[in-house]
Amino acid sequence: MGEPSDEETLDTLKSERSSQRGSGPPDLPPSLVKVVCADDLQQSPSRHWLEGCEEVRVLRGRSGAVRQEGHSLTIVLADRYASVRHLLLRRAQDAFVVLDEGSTNGTSVDGRRLAAAEERPVQTAVLEVGHTFFHLRTPARGARDAPTDERTGDPLTLNPEFSLTLSAAGRLARRAHDLLLTGESGVGKEVVARWLHRVSGRQGTLVAVNCAALPEHLLEDELFGHLKGAFSGAHSDRPGLIRAAEQGTLLLDEIGDMPLSLQAKLLRVIEDRRVRPLGGEREVPVDVQVIAATNRDLQALVAEGRFRQDLLARQGLLRLPVPPLRARREDLGLLIRQILREVPEGLAGIRFEMDALRTLLLHDWPLNVRELRRVLLAAVDLARTEEGKAIVIGPQHLPLTASEAAPPPRRAADISLSAEDQVLRTRIVELLAEHRGNVAAVARALARPRTQVQRLMARLGIQRRET
């Protein structure tokens, strides 16, 4: 079978937007993603579809195999910190019940350890088994398969909804359609645009323009170019960035910040593929694919008179949402690997303490992938000791404030604690009373980093008023 038609691709995008609004039916089985192992970043993330599964077991073994027997799935981990009987997921209508099967190190759900014999129903959660993190999602909407990064062989995403978006976007890019990428700041819209350019097969380069970075008169010259003598200082012809993207892709980042006067000229380029340089009387034909990106609500800008309705209708017809990082936690393993490949030590030379990796997986990432990148690269530099030695990233190396790194505290009555955690909780409460609520002093007494103690207080439901 060939690729879907343009009409079928458009229907796919419309269906996805309906699903995101909650009106579309769940069209995929639940998924369980092995996100990342703290001790071995070279292990690739993997996704398991739980189609027809009534029970899922995760346990330690040598093979690292996956076995399906009837309605039961067994995932075997080569993780020495997991137990030979560890995690059980049991289907319960539209959710799964999580149980620990008597493991040595326990099982945690969203950073909270399960008590003995506790049965916790969840739909979407981060699960800890030994030193390996999983992400459970049920129900799932979107596509089973995602495009791969041709440079690494890794999938671009393990999130079903984002998989659907990228698959449709790739088909449209190969047919030279103009596209609009939407999403919060830092979600990776430019990364998506560069991938779309690579898969489009266009022979020219990708030229990126930040529409918010330049004042109006400079932006016009940058985009459209000028002829010699067009204005004072124009000593020679300049083709401009639109023409520089000939047979390639023009990325207009932050298009919502483009001045109104330039929007009319841009519309002419998009509709007729012709550009008139400053000081010129003739229009020059151009062959460019236009990808725009914005973190703004363009329809709201239209209502305010700050964005042209006709430009939105033309460029915004094929709108591709890039989800925030907090909505696709199953991608954190892929992104961590992608970012840390850039450091000299490589993936083989870096591992994480569990508290640090747990913080990364549970953090809400308000600044998205851009923030993750900043945090990881800074953590590597802070954790680096001697040349050639392995890097071990702990929570003290993560440049996140305590309020960012720790989840909100819960009441003790809402938490089921193991005997070990009960002892630890009592000790921290006693130390807080002894040191009059000084967390730094408690951290010194426990020989732990202050940020780790703050996270323990949140996990164990300790409020300062208890002291």
Label each region the model flagged.
Residues R91, H197-G204, G279-Q289, D297-E404, ...:
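Nucleotide-binding/hydrolysis machinery
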Residues M1-R80, R90:
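Intrinsically disordered, low-complexity acidic Ser/Thr-rich regulatory segments
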Residues T165, V187, V209, L223, ...:
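Conserved RecA-like P-loop NTPase ATPase core
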Residues A168-G233, R243-P259, D287, P324-R329, ...:
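Conserved post-Walker A coupling segment in P-loop NTPases
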Residues M1-S23, D27-L28, V36, Q43-S44, ...:
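Bacterial C-terminal helix-turn-helix
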Residues G2-R21, V58, R91-T104, S108-L158:
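C-terminal boundary/linker segments immediately following FHA domains
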Residues K228, S261-P285, A293-A303:
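Conserved catalytic/switch belt of AAA+ P-loop NTPases
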Residues A143-S167, H217, H363, L417:
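Dynamic helix-loop-helix/coil hinge segments at AAA+ ATPase domain boundaries and subdomain interfaces
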